[in-house]
């Protein structure tokens, strides 16, 4: 739309000439099918939610840009090893639902890429090597521009306000049990960008199973 509202697939439409600023081209791209691009990011679990003050926990999130269906998994470290494990899990999880992941988009964190590492810039991370082995394209957003991963960023803000504000975790296993329940609720909740279908309903209307 000319005023920047989102269309049914959740992608901002092009602005008019009267708009006082220009959008990045990546923000106007329209996804045509599930799995075409999946946004991935990491959320640090708030300390107040963790029973053990010495423990750190991290929520990895994947969200399909077309259907908005998410996959969540918790880890005890934010590293390229966790990222590589997560991508293997998300590929299998989406595949079981009829989605073949073609491209994964991330920010420039060291858990994903060595792009800005002074000493390892030319060395691929385990995450990047895993993507190559799986035949998945890796797209990096512009540095310091989290809005380019806006769907997963917004989902994290909602998790912070509606999930982490009222839950407590005693281990990483406990986090994953509670994340599974959270995932089921959010994937089955109607969304305005999907014309009030839930991500699961929108997915079922979009995917042809073998």
Predicted features along the sequence, with ranges:
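Acidic/histidine-rich, metal-coordinating catalytic segments
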Residues: 97-119, 142-144, 197-199
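Active-site beta-loop-alpha junctions of metal-dependent nucleic acid enzymes
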Residues: 55, 73-100
